[in-house]
Amino acid sequence: MNIDFESRNITRRSFLKGAGVVGAAGLLSACGGSKSNNSGSTAASGAQAPNSTGATPLKEYISWESANREIESWNLLYSQTLSDANVVTNLWDGLMSFDCYGKLVPAIATSWEANEDSTVWTFHLRDDVDWVDCNGEVKEHITATDFLVGLEWVLNASKNEANNTSMPTLYIVGAEEYYEKTKDMGAAAADLRYQDMLDAGVGIEAPDDYTLVFTCKHSCPYFDTVVSYTSFYPASQALIDELGIETFRGCDNTNMWYCGPYIVEEYIQGNTKSYIPNPHYYNAANVSRFERLTVTMISDQAIAFQLYQNRELDEMDLNESTITTITSDPNNEYNSQLCEKRARPTAYAMHFNYQKNNADGTPDVNWNKAIANTAFRQCFYRGLNLKAWFSRYNKINPLKCENDYYTMKGLCYNTQGAEYTTLVAKEMGFDAEKYDGETMIRLRANGGDISALKKQAMEELSAIGVTFPVKATYFIIASSTSALDNATILKQCFTDSFGDDFIKLDVQTYVSSLTQEVRTPQLQSFVINGWSADFGDPVNFLGQETLHDDNAFYSHYYSNIARVAEAPADYQKDLMDAFEQYTDLVNTANAIVNDTDARYEAFAKAEAYLLENVLVSPTYYDIAWSLTHANEYSKINAMYGGCNYKAVNWETSEEAYTTVQYEQFAKAFDAAIQG
């Protein structure tokens, strides 16, 4: 179907419906009929949207999603993908939500507290929350029982098919045993109800209709962040009984029940989703919502740019070529409207392999000896200038991508409001350093001069038989020209920073699976990988690098330090001592369960030790540029959970935001999170 991007004789919404912007009309699923015409400002009435610029806010908003990220499951209890959660977060609320700084705020829970050792958590619920159907008609009142039903569904292997069990089985008393029981029962487990779960000793109870109590296996001072995960969302037994287990598991927008800020007005698979306000939303008086929110599936950014220019999109992310098109023309109207977004909630780092093999399966002793040396590793953190490489991710402000920490910024705050990584910066001695657009923060102390460290490393390593240059093997997928371009620039960064007489990047390729072709046979010198949090505590990051823990992901699957620990070579003694000391620091911090500030201070010391010894070397944040009519800094910005696409309290403007305005938003945001 042809798309006439010049037409102005149709509405924005009718254009999107008729255009089929991803090339196929898809399957139409609608609910509510003409009733949507009555939603308007009445259903959306409540708190005024934030307005820091005096602009005229938008009543309707058109956002976008990549065509390869279409929703697959509308059931949050069953789904395990963010692409699903990004949709359903607007339709289905849980105990907790987040604000624009990523801090926990009440949702269905109004308040919560823990006992002294943080093993028992009590949540007090609102008494005014209803389930509604796709027409916005009230079906049932939500009580604490709905959360019992939801957890039983998740833990019942016959019902939820083992999805989303990891969080409750890891933390809740009896949850793992109940899951195993249902797995052993097979199909018969489908007949179990929440009372069977309680009788089996699972650590959840509802002493009254609006109180929910969880009992944890061990002290868990961050459990309020754990229950933000979708495993702990409510479900209605009445709806499950009405639909049956199979249909409830595979429910869609037409037969599910809603308790979130919106209901689905219309869904055209592969094309658009439109939401209108839930007329019985419990928090309507306290949050602003759009009269209509439309999400358009986009298969090509060139199409997205045309749609944005024609005001058929209100926001879009920009790739490098589009930015180049705009910035290469000084008269381009969008030059003043380029808006830099906040970092995506993932911290990327260079994960060294301490037990590397050659292609024939024999140990790569040269690399293994080199990477076990502290001075050698410190050259990466203190001397590798990645500014040119960052430009691949942020063409305009490459150093905004600099990541100096292992834990993602914004993960958690102490009781004084200070963001956790500011505590790490203080431990590292660069808390007074600020972004200047010129020099990486961690290179400023010595100007990136690692000549003394390099000399020390080469002398110490030559004495144990290491030959130079040390080859650092880095794998990229063979089919990606972009990955090759990135790797070529990274290789030049190695040359410029280390000198080819010291460390030389060797770029290799894999066909399809990094895990099977590279990580499992242990062929890499390092992998650059990102970690996104599961919950809001530093141990979720720092615990991935410890020894003596089967759940330490990177220790087992990337660095292989857990394998080294089984039989370390003589040259790995100092390395193992460093990991043991780091592990002790993490465990000491994790044992502090009744003093949040002391806990975070202790974790900051552990993280600083990790960084000073460069057991892993942080690399970058992913920061995109956009054209937009929404203030990104007004949106939910959680580092964990699935709430970031919840469209409440967005500040918007009829006029596109400018670069200057976004710089002001960023400055205010940074000041706020630094306490």
Report residues per predicted region.
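N-terminal secretory signal peptides
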Residues: 1-10, 14, 18-28
